[in-house]
């Protein structure tokens, strides 16, 4: 489910909770919630499996949409709201998973294909930003001025012979070469007035040093790109090698946030609206469950030692047999009732987005 915690006290409120017990006809998953400019006035989240779709909330109203088309790989996946326009950048991913028998990291989640989409909620229209067979693009994130879109990119043709390989073999071959799949950080320029994009540009070539980047997030002042770096792949929540890094766009330098990192997973992250705090998912306590950690980020671009999100009962999080993930910081609370969200989710398939070129 989705929950919100008031960081000024101990209050926890349920935004929406799916079924706690398995129900064949109603079982579904809630994930990938995202907010515009750190506010809940414009927000969205995905529903997977039964009653699937994307729930978009604007002007206090919720609607379900299907961001699908014959040219789109699956549907909208990882989102990022444009800061000034009524637009959302999505990746669209064909994702699967495999299980290791002897590797200490038991699950490997991988994409077999991914592209980038631009969605207009007001018009309910969607189009491609980037659509390629040789590259896998994912995790889009806008700069605060809305003129640059950052994303992660894997040059798949450097790992597989795509010229001769049939599509039906790609997933199997990626699984066999899972530790060779590595992502760099790229960007494209964007003109908000004409809504046109420039050509891809390299920002951080992580594969050149044998690493892989995921989850770029630009700081509110536009100076830093916070990202997660690991040894391979793009689902770093399962990778003990994953750490938080930043790219200082002004100084053109990259460095790890060592005081905040740990020897275990440090993965999904978000900035506070003033750029002085970061919240991220970590498995540093037991290696099994992700828990939210908070770290201060000073004006010189340095992080302080991270601490677990406090609870009134200090043992609550450690004894909870559930994982936290996808932490997001907002300046206001979600106010739409859970009953309205449930009605929106259960009441039909929703409106299909119109595909444009």
Roles of regions detected by a PLM:
Residues 1-357:
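Sequence signature of WD/YWTD-type beta-propeller architectures
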């Amino acid at each position: 489910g989705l929950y919100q915690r008031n960081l000024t006290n101990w209050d926890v409120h349920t935004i929406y909770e799916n079924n706690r017990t398995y129900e064949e006809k109603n079982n579904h998953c809630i994930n990938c919630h995202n907010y515009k400019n750190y506010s809940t006035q414009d927000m969205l989240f995905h529903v997977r499996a039964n009653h699937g779709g994307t729930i978009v909330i604007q002007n206090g109203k919720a609607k379900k949409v299907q961001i699908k088309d014959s040219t789109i790989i699956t549907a909208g996946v990882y989102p990022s709201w444009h800061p000034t326009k009524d637009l959302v950048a999505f990746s669209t991913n064909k994702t699967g998973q495999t299980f290791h028998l002897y590797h200490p990291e038991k699950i490997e989640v991988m994409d077999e294909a991914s592209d980038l989409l631009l969605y207009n909620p007001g018009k309910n229209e969607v189009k491609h930003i980037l659509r390629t067979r040789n590259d896998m693009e994912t995790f889009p994130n806008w700069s605060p001025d809305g003129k640059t879109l950052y994303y992660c990119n894997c040059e798949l043709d450097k790992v597989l012979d795509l010229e001769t390989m049939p599509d039906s073999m790609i997933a199997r071959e990626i699984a066999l070469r899972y530790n060779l799949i590595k992502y760099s950080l790229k960007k494209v320029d964007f003109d908000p007035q004409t809504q046109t994009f420039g050509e891809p540009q390299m920002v951080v070539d992580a594969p050149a040093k044998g690493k892989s980047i995921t989850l770029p997030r630009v700081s509110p002042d536009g100076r830093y790109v916070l990202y997660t770096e690991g040894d391979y792949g793009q689902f770093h929540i399962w990778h003990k090698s994953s750490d938080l890094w930043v790219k200082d766009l002004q100084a053109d330098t990259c460095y790890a946030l060592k005081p905040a990192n740990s020897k275990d997973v440090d993965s999904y992250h978000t900035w506070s609206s003033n750029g002085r705090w970061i919240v991220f998912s970590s498995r540093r306590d037991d290696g099994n469950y992700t828990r939210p950690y908070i770290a201060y980020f000073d004006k010189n671009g340095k992080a302080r030692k991270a601490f677990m999100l406090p609870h009134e009962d200090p043992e609550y999080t450690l004894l909870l047999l559930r994982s936290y993930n996808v932490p997001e910081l907002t300046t206001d609370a979600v106010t739409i009732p859970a009953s309205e969200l449930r009605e929106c989710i259960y009441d039909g398939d929703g409106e299909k987005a119109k595909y444009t070129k």
